[in-house]
Amino acid sequence: MGANVAYLVPDRFKYGYGLTPKIADVAFSTFQPDLLVTVDNGISSHAGVERAQAHGMQVIITDHHLTTKETPKAEAVVNPNQLGCEFPSKALAGVGVAFYLLANLSSYRSQSGKSSSKVAQYLDLVALGTYADVASLDYNNRILVDAGVKRIRQNQCRAGISALLEIAKRDPAGLKAQDLGFVLGPRLNAAGRMETMDIGIECLLAADLQTAYPLAQQLNQLNTERRQVESQMKQEALSELTQ
């Protein structure tokens, strides 16, 4: 749609969870953006929103977490679980909320005669994020996951997803929803647990298989290392119990 987009995945141990004032500072100093959009966080980030706005940024919060407090004074807050929201599907994962924001933006631009994005192309990511986040599969989430799985089976998906499935020796044509959570999810999550989540993001953003495959290989190796570390920790814990 013409926007110059960059992402920032904060280290929660260093900066805290969500849109904190420190993260607003980092976003400003690194990118100097006009607009800051949160994904899967921000519903309680009053101070962070204020700091971002003090830097001259507009803020859109997309989140799905429950709250009993007043929402931050951002330019827009998109959350089916915010107080007073009548959106019927309360079980949306963060990726689902972001998808509906994009769908509505695309529809608005199309009706205004402006260029818009075909949002169906993102359903593979929506399905992956919904299932891997263990969101409740209510009626709406089942539709989103089913649509995304069908696109992956037809090879209408990110090159990164295709690369991960190839490395895991999974045939996309026979993909099951469970594979999103038990084949793709662990490999992507291993990046954040062992190194940095950027590897997983770059894999999913890769424009072609040639770019995605080396990143998918890194993710697969990190997942192997994660499993080894977890197994060792389990053995050490059991050893302590038997002493």
What are these regions (language model features)?
Residues 93-101, 124, 180:
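Catalytic-loop motifs flanking and including active-site residues across diverse enzymes
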Residues 44, 86-94, 120-123, 140:
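Short, well-structured alpha-helical patches and their helix-loop capping segments
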Residues 25, 29-91, 99-111:
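Active-site cavity-forming subdomains of large catalytic enzyme subunits
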Residues 1-35, 55, 73, 107-243:
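Hydrophobic helix-and-loop "lid/oligomerization" segment in the mid-to-C-terminal part
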